Amino acid sequence: MDLITLGKAAKDAAFQLATASTAQKNKALAIIADELEANAADILAANSKDIELGRQAGLSEAMLDRLLLNESRLNGIANDVRNVISLTDPVGSEIDSKVLENGMQLSRRRVPLGVVGVIYEARPNVTIDIAALCLKTGNASILRGGKETFFSNMELVKVIQSALAKAGLPAASVQYIEKPDRELVTQLLKLDDYVDMIIPRGGAGLHKMCKENSTIPVIIGGFGISHIFVDETADLAKSVDVVENAKAQRPSACNALDTLLVHERIAEQFLPMLVAKLNGKVTFVVEPKAKAYMTKAEQVRDASDGDFDTEWLSYTLGVKVVADVQEAIDHMREHNASHSDAIMTNHLQNAELFINSAGSAAVYVNASTRFTDGAQFGLGAEVAVSTQKLHARGPMGLEELTSYKWVGKANYLSRA
């Protein structure tokens, strides 16, 4: 596969998309949604191949469930595309405007990024989500999904490209790297003549590889240890419910709770309540002070080196007792708190200290970490959750897939 040819085609498509009207882009999205439903039999047949190969490869049931498409899920994906149609198109909107002393009207106008390369996990719905968001914002995309969803993704991209052609937009607006060869990922990361941004969705290893090898700006996101600190002033019963939601609602999510920090003055009362709530469901990984109050835990082990640096993505929870909010913050700084973190407290000053000190992309007071999500934030779908500080931070919706240009309008004005 020649990635330079792919890149050239994407760049040409991006120039056309940049001037496409919202109506034309929405028309393409509507056709994509309809074609997903019309081609359900072919898509589900391709997905069945992926599922069978996954079983032969020994994938876990949880992983197979992430790969699985059925009629209900496919209809949901189609409706998600229709929801993108209803979102406001940010392209062309003015961020701000002013008239200078020389009479020039100067504004900042939102524009597409250009070509976005996305390397992502083995979830077929992500292929559609990313394509739809990039299309709505006038960006061309080059996609590289997990090898476990190869047949599903090939069929989905075929449907997308057919819909684009029917809408009068270039099929190369959405392209897929067909071969699972890892060397092609390395080549994509060097394609800076054609690709404007790389978004890796996956584990720390993928992010590290992209940062070290890419000559293209990389948005780092998804990975980060999520914490909840239960302060001494917190409502303990309500805090237990929030911790359960953050840990057990969807433990494989990147915004699920990894480490629980508990104020030493309420640990003796709070931790037995937590054990009673989560016993039989969660494995507790504990330091000595916490262990002393968790004697009735059914699944528990002592914390070892690296445990508090682990994004569990499972029914495992690190637990530590701390002296106060400052020690909680210090622990978070030491253990990669960059994604979603929360404090349970009824103390205003402690809440503000936590908000101002936490280095996370999203910080919550008396709320679950599970809210870090484009849909929950009212952004619609998201292309990723950024944990870095440049360009975008937190859930990346439509606006985060744009940049801006300065536009100056005057009456044949020359600089003095």
Curated annotation (Swiss-Prot):
InterPro entries in UniProt: Ald_DH/histidinol_DH, Ald_DH_C, Ald_DH_N, Aldehyde_DH_dom, G-glutamylP_reductase_CS, Glu-5-SA_DH, GPR_dom
GO molecular function: glutamate-5-semialdehyde dehydrogenase activity; NADP binding
Any one of the GO BP annotations: L-proline biosynthetic process
UniProt keyword Nucleotide-binding present: no
Enzyme class, broadest EC rank: oxidoreductase
Major location (coarse): cytoplasm
GO cellular component: cytoplasm
Keyword Cytoplasm: yes
CDD domains on file: ALDH_F18-19_ProA-GPR (cd07079)
Protein's pathway: Amino-acid biosynthesis; L-proline biosynthesis; L-glutamate 5-semialdehyde from L-glutamate: step 2/2
One protein family per Pfam: Aldedh
EC number: 1.2.1.41
Keyword set, alphabetical order: Amino-acid biosynthesis, Cytoplasm, NADP, Oxidoreductase, Proline biosynthesis
Catalytic activity field: L-glutamate 5-semialdehyde + phosphate + NADP(+) = L-glutamyl 5-phosphate + NADPH + H(+)
Compartmental location: Cytoplasm
Function: Catalyzes the NADPH-dependent reduction of L-glutamate 5-phosphate into L-glutamate 5-semialdehyde and phosphate. The product spontaneously undergoes cyclization to form 1-pyrroline-5-carboxylate.
Family: Belongs to the gamma-glutamyl phosphate reductase family.
Official protein name in the record: Gamma-glutamyl phosphate reductase
